[in-house]
Amino acid sequence: LRSNPTVDCTAAVAQDQSCTVSIKIHAQVSPSDSPRKDEVIIRGVAIQSLQNLAWDVNFYTRNTFSRANMDADSFLDYVAFTAANGKQDSPTAGTGDQYKYQARGLDIRYRDMSATEEITTTSQVHFSIVNRSTTVKSEGADGAIVVILAVEPIE
């Protein structure tokens, strides 16, 4: 599953601020109509970013979540990346080369409770991307970021 860098998280993001993203599960994971089309296991998280920043990817089970109200917060799990985790393809990388981050071997059982409660076929993985660096994530194309999720369907 892959976020869209021209649509998702395009604004500037200051330290400890976040942007939210939802990626559709159904039809990307399994072409069949599985009875559990709203449920996957997240096995890996990768980030492509034009800026070398520290990132957290926080997963939520609903499309509504609140930092102010713990009863309404549907937080499930998170994956943290430091700036040192960011690797470039070229040892002599220059402007415009991407930083790539990766976490494998995860076992995050994810169920879209919004889809379950709303009885919809549009299941999504809901997450936020949090900038943990003192440097502001740039807006627009200069701050492009993509989150890629490796998921396994639960049949």
Where do the PLM segments sit?
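Intrinsically disordered, low-complexity segments enriched in Ser/Pro/Gly/Ala and basic residues
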Residues: 2, 17, 21, 29, ...
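Short, surface-exposed beta-strand/loop "edge" segments at domain boundaries and coil↔beta transitions
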Residues: 14, 54-55, 65-69, 110, ...
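Hydrophobic side chains in beta-strands
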Residues: 47, 59, 81, 101, ...
